[in-house]
Amino acid sequence: MLLGFFRLLFKGLYRVRLTGDTQALYQQKVLITPNHVSFLDGILLALFLPVRPVFAVYTSISQRWFMRALTPIIDFVPLDPTKPMSIKHLVRLIEQGRPVVIFPEGRISVSGSLMKIYDGAAFVAAKSQATIVPLRIEGAELTPFSRLKGLVKRRLFPRIQLHLLPPTHLPMPEAPRARDRRKIAGEMLHQIMMEARMAVRPRETLYESLLAAQDRFGARKPCVEDINFQPDTYRKLLTKTLFVARILEKYSQPGEKIGLMLPNAGISAAVIFGAIARGRIPAMMNYTAGVKGLSSAIAAAELNTIFTSRTFLDKGKLWHLPEQLTQVRWVFLEDLKGDITLADKLWIFAHLLAPRLAQVKQQPEDAAMILFTSGSEGNPKGVVHSHKSLLSNVEQIKTIADFTANDRFMSALPLFHSFGLTVGLLTPLLTGAEVFLYPSPLHYRVVPELVYDRNCTVLFGTSTFLANYARFANPYDFYRLRYVVAGAEKLQESTKQLWQDKFGLRILEGYGVTECAPVVSINVPMAAKVGTVGRILPGMDARLLAMPGIDQGGRLQLKGPNIMKGYLRVENPGVLEAPAAENQHGEMEAGWYDTGDIVTFDEQGYVRIQGRAKRFAKIAGEMISLEMVEQVALGASPDKMHATAIKQDASKGEALVLFTTDNELTREALLRYARQHGVPELAVPRDIRWLKQLPVLGSGKPDYVTLKNMVDEAETTHE
């Protein structure tokens, strides 16, 4: 009677809905593992699960008065993690056929993300061999009974959903010591909990995700700021988005691919979301690629119009691009204000009241944006991403990192760079954090000063950029930082040590590729290992393809929701080439993407990058990583830049060419370092060429295409 009354009350107030297959709850041995977001969680499960479970409640909570008051509707047993007998009691209950609920986090989330997972829950699952039923509670974190005050827009009676996920099992790990078995089991349960979060992510478009963020964090919450130092709230960003959306319709057609050549600025975010809302597909133009690279991008994506800014072209000294790229129409944002009419203003006002109506009909699987590869190994390729792939990567990042609305991101990597777009714009916008968009990562004195002035807590960049920020920064500039993330190139040991010594900060290294939107793996405070790029993100499958001549590791192939829709190539303009990869049997498998990177996995699942498959030289029958050669050069000459190319050799097949900005670097110095660090002599180049400055791409990576051309030209001249 009492249970029925409370069930009706909660259903009326919170519109509680239970989804998923409930049959798993009736199996012989069941362990239910929900996330923990509010004080309502236990009551919700007791009221709406079709079985009457036993709740494991920590003794510090079970002894409070309100737990005694809940005794008529909730069965619970005290859990003391310091006493093994309480764990054994839970195992016995499961073996007797009672469904048991354990909150693996052990406490209510204070970030909105998963907290750490206690090993005890995992050990109970493994010891009892119970069927694990993951459960996601969504919506209760918005109530006053959560611990997210100030992080979300709380409301009295939000809609609450209880998602039952497909059942799984957790085998008892094999390890000599019980402590190790518990730890491994805990990591396995953590993976299950992360996969559960990914499984219930909403099906929405990028524009809908912006509206959802506004609803979750509040229309008046500041979200974007740029060098004008006028922060935009979600409401103001939406207003700009609708303005741009309305005007873009006059210059493009639904479904058309349009080029965007814009700096890191608040208006750029509005243009991206505005174009997407009205069914246009923004192609982010890499203005550092030069006329040749941009011509390839324009041809591959079949672009007719590029939107840019006169101010941006003036400050960036980029007017030569529209002057030479005459095959497209150039539209300047400054000219659009004059096109606004009374009808347009009325349309914008009406859609501010009902913003969802501004979006043309779209599906999450539809093409949303086009990014371009760097062209470091040939012509730039258009990488077409769907709403689903981009938002999946954001959700993967949110699942493993505890970013909150209290964070402030410093985003200086360009938005045409996948790292800059997903991590630098979409992730902060959709987690309620505020982002400061700065137009150039090369201003090594300015960026640290802005990090200090704007109280930024998250900074990311390439190893090169982070090293230069550290050189010019005051030791106190980064006092608020809690995440420093390196990606896009290998993190140098000297950079890591400099940040540790000067600022007391640990750089977290990650790995990504444009085709994966881009983050594939990353170290986070909860799971980090020196010398690796972290674990593969939840929701992704990974496999290694064996490579002849390479004993350790193989080519990394990936499959998951964040994989691109496909390539657009200049050789076949406008035709989408869906991802497919060759498996170990020599067959092409659709949906898999071959990264071309040689990696290894350790026993804990951490990834180590060995190098690009294309960046291996076969010398006297041995496979030599060009990246290893560059690491030797950096070890011998840490303050200079180095890059390696390959030339043909009559006696050994291939030979190494080292380009360096150190005019005093000798082979003897390289040999000395190689011998000290166990590097084979074959990896020490004989051909060392000095350059005043290495050719680099906009991302800061060496331009290997140009370097290879320099080698080939020299060989031709020599012949």
Swiss-Prot record:
Membrane topology: Multi-pass membrane protein
Gene Ontology CC: one annotated term: plasma membrane
GO molecular function, one term: acyl-[acyl-carrier-protein]-phospholipid O-acyltransferase activity
Region of interest: Acyltransferase: 15-138
GO biological process: fatty acid metabolic process; phospholipid biosynthetic process
UniProt-listed Enzyme Commission number(s): 2.3.1.40, 6.2.1.20
Protein location: Cell inner membrane
Signal peptide: none
Superkingdom as given in the UniProt entry: Bacteria
Residue ranges, annotated region (AMP-binding): 233-646
Similarity comment: family membership: In the N-terminal section; belongs to the 2-acyl-GPE acetyltransferase family. In the C-terminal section; belongs to the ATP-dependent AMP-binding enzyme family.
Role this protein plays: Plays a role in lysophospholipid acylation. Transfers fatty acids to the 1-position via an enzyme-bound acyl-ACP intermediate in the presence of ATP and magnesium. Its physiological function is to regenerate phosphatidylethanolamine from 2-acyl-glycero-3-phosphoethanolamine (2-acyl-GPE) formed by transacylation reactions or degradation by phospholipase A1.
Protein name: Bifunctional protein Aas
